[in-house]
Design a protein with these regions (language model features):
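Post-transcriptional modification and biogenesis factors for structured RNAs
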Residues: 1-138
Length: 138
């Protein structure tokens, strides 16, 4: 945390009761970057907003949104404030957004796993997630 952010946090702590501050600190410690969610080319923004809300609910800190044909617009009535607590990275260059996102995730040490409706693929329950960080693409 930068000095400016640290000083701001210290200043703002004066205005929060200890019980609330302890709750925030507890919840922050329960967040995970071991699992991240990747949403590729989702047609309806409310589906992304609902996914962000679910990520927040499960303690997932990072959500990656890949825009190829569809542009993400947060639906605040669906995300219900979760977008303020979950870090969102949007890949929206002119081309190769999926490839760029996958490369970044792999460079960051994630095993990339794509959800697929095919029967011949492996079952999600067979994937070992305790050792390596995983990025689930939907």
């Amino acid at each position: 945390m930068s000095n400016l952010n640290h000083n701001l946090v210290q200043y703002l702590k004066e205005f929060v009761v200890d019980e609330r501050r302890e709750l925030f600190e507890e919840k922050i410690q329960q967040r995970t970057k071991h699992i991240t969610i990747v949403l590729e080319n989702i047609f309806q923004g409310r589906n992304i907003s609902a996914s962000i809300r679910s990520a927040d609910c499960f303690g997932v800190q990072d959500v990656h949104v890949i825009e190829n044909d569809n542009i993400f617009n947060d639906d605040s009535e669906v995300s219900m404030g979760a977008d303020k607590w979950v870090s969102t990275t949007i890949y929206n260059q002119e081309e190769n957004n999926t490839a760029k996102a996958i490369k970044k995730l792999k460079d960051d040490g994630y095993q990339v796993i794509a959800a697929t409706p095919h029967n011949a693929d492996c079952d999600l329950y067979d994937i070992e997630i305790s050792e390596q960080k995983i990025a689930l693409i939907f």
